[in-house]
Amino acid sequence: EQVRGGGVDSSVDNMLKITNDGRKLALDQRMLNAMLPDFEKSKINACVDNVYRIWEENKDKKSAQLVFCDLSTPKNDGTFSVYNDIRKKLIERGVPESEVRFIHEAETDVKKKELFQKVRKGEVRVLMGSTQKMGAGTNVQDRLIALHDVDCPWRPADLEQRSGRIIRQGNSNPKVEIYRYVTKQTFDAYLYQLVE
């Protein structure tokens, strides 16, 4: 109410800042403070559990998965990143590092084309990216078995773009799974209500 009523300096606190902090907290508390512990029942850990289980169950078919996350994109500056955390945990469980890639690593159209080909062949089995980088134009459906929405995008069209990566012609899997991870009593519920 203080923010709405103008009782707070907008350079210190405003609805956009509150909304952004709410999204970060719903994703992982370490985004607000890297010194906080890795909450065992976080949606990041739930995602890692599902990605690993599906990876293990589909080893023989070399099925692939997409993980979408618009916040906390990969960083190489030592700060906490959800992308780095998920990859590290999957590697610790036995997924080869070469099979877990970030779309952000493909900095040119040529590199992106090569990366997409590796996903289509089952050489890369977990591809992580933001809606902007891995939405429209990402045609890797051939072996996709699961898609994971770790956060909620702002626009309904973005959620549709994400789902459109796996639910499309050319996918060899007759049945696919889409997981949406929501942290109870956080900003997640509000965001999903906005986009649906």
Map each language-model feature to its residues.
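Short beta-strand segments
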Residues: 23, 64-71, 99-105, 127-131, ...
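Short, solvent-exposed loop/turn segments at secondary-structure junctions
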Residues: 25-32, 70-74, 107-108, 133-135, ...
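Conserved helicase ATPase core of P-loop NTP-dependent helicases/translocases
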Residues: 87, 96-131
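Conserved helicase motor "Helicase C" RecA-like lobe of SF1/SF2 P-loop NTPases
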Residues: 71-104
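Soluble or luminal CAZymes and related metallo-dependent hydrolases
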Residues: 14, 39-47, 78, 82, ...
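SF2 helicase motor core recognition
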Residues: 22, 75, 113-116, 127-149, ...
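A conserved SF2-helicase RecA2
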Residues: 157-160, 166-196
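Interdomain linker/hinge connecting the two RecA-like lobes of the SF2 helicase core
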Residues: 1-73
